[in-house]
Amino acid sequence: MASMAFSTTFFTPLRDFNQPRTNSTPSTSLPFTKSSIASSKSPFFQLGFSQQASSNFPIVPSKTRSFSVNAKAIKDKTIYDFTVKDIDKKDVSLSKFKGKVLLIVNVASRCGLTSSNYTELSHLYENFKNKGLEVLAFPCNQFGMQEPGSNEEIKQFACTKFKAEFPIFDKVDVNGPFTAPVYQFLKSSSGGFFGDIVKWNFEKFLVDKNGKVVERYPPTTSPFQIEKDIQKLLAA
């Protein structure tokens, strides 16, 4: 059975993440080459540039691994095939979101991107939740150890400081040998342009009403930049 191995080309200029100096920071001097992709819905593809992932980029040390994913298995699966635990450790079948557009994000409380992303995610959810949008937040502590708190602390932070009303789930790994199955699916379904690795906090996956991943956005893409893509899927 045919399989496809994903490359590690990453299509967007990842610039300064404004992290605390005590944590490692992404490389800011990455070479750019003209992309062969003519167009895309995503703002970073529209820039027309691509770049190779730098070995200096702060990914999970020693745990990351490349793997091939069976093409038919990807085609046959949807997000609805997975059950995850919510922030209170209760099982949640993602089939409950059938027929909705999903924006899935790995979040962190102490990242330079935290404030802008939580604020904009909350606005998007407020504006489109009654039209069929769900934002699903998965806390992750793999990038700079920027989500160290307990589930209760994470929930308190998001719901109190940013008035987050969208679902927040149990803390997960998004890379490495302990990657949550739902993230194995998300990464496998989003093609070879990004490779297997989630690059940093607040990488985003857009899932259509049929449970299929239709777009993947780098951490530096703000939620507001995704609004038009969300509206198109909601109208479909």
UniProtKB/Swiss-Prot annotation:
Gene Ontology terms: cellular component: chloroplast stroma
Domain of life: Eukaryota
Matching Gene3D superfamilies: Glutaredoxin
Transit peptide (residue range): 1-64
Enzyme class: oxidoreductase
Coiled coil: none
GO biological process: response to oxidative stress
Record's keyword terms, sorted: Chloroplast, Oxidoreductase, Peroxidase, Plastid, Transit peptide
Enzyme Commission identifier(s): 1.11.1.12
Record flagged with keyword Isomerase: no
CDD domains xref list: GSH_Peroxidase (cd00340)
Any Pfam family the entry gives: GSHPx
Keyword Ribonucleoprotein: no
Annotated localization: Plastid, Chloroplast stroma
Catalysed reactions listed for this entry: a hydroperoxy polyunsaturated fatty acid + 2 glutathione = a hydroxy polyunsaturated fatty acid + glutathione disulfide + H2O
Active site (record annotation): C111
GO terms, molecular function: phospholipid-hydroperoxide glutathione peroxidase activity
Family to which this protein belongs: Belongs to the glutathione peroxidase family.
Role this protein plays: Protects cells and enzymes from oxidative damage, by catalyzing the reduction of hydrogen peroxide, lipid peroxides and organic hydroperoxide, by glutathione.
The protein's name in its UniProt record: Phospholipid hydroperoxide glutathione peroxidase, chloroplastic
Originating organism: Pisum sativum (Garden pea)
